Amino acid sequence: MNNSDFKILLVDDEPDILEFVSYNLRKEGFEVQTADNGESGLKKAKEYIPHLILLDVMMPGMDGIETCDQIRSTSKLENTLIAFLTARGEDYSQVAGFNAGADDYITK
């Protein structure tokens, strides 16, 4: 699979993070979509069917843990990889992320 065939959804409420990370992923040839909150991230995930979702934990409204849980309960997204990309590095936050169905947990 070429990078251009690999679809990534980036979900973060910080515009600077969305811009920086999506720019660098696109520069490497990946197809990238973005969402600025959990609700729009879930909606885009259902429409876009990405291979990978990079998800922030701390977001207003539906946080990343709930978003991950909702994604995992959507059958057409069962093969999508989910990695939290977040400033929260505490053990309890990582455990909550993995319990919600995350495949990886990366601290910013």
Predicted regions and their residues:
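Receiver (REC) domain active-site loop signature in two-component systems and cognate sites
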Residues: M59
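Charged docking surfaces used in two-component/phosphorelay signaling
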Residues: E19-K27
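Short hydrophobic/Thr-rich beta-strand motif most characteristic of the beta2 strand and flanking loop
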Residues: G29-D36, K44
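Short amphipathic alpha-helix used as the core "switch/output" element in two-component signaling
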Residues: K43, I65-E78
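Acidic catalytic/metal-coordinating carboxylates
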Residues: D36-S40, D63-E66
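Active-site beta3 strand of CheY-like receiver
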Residues: Y48-L54
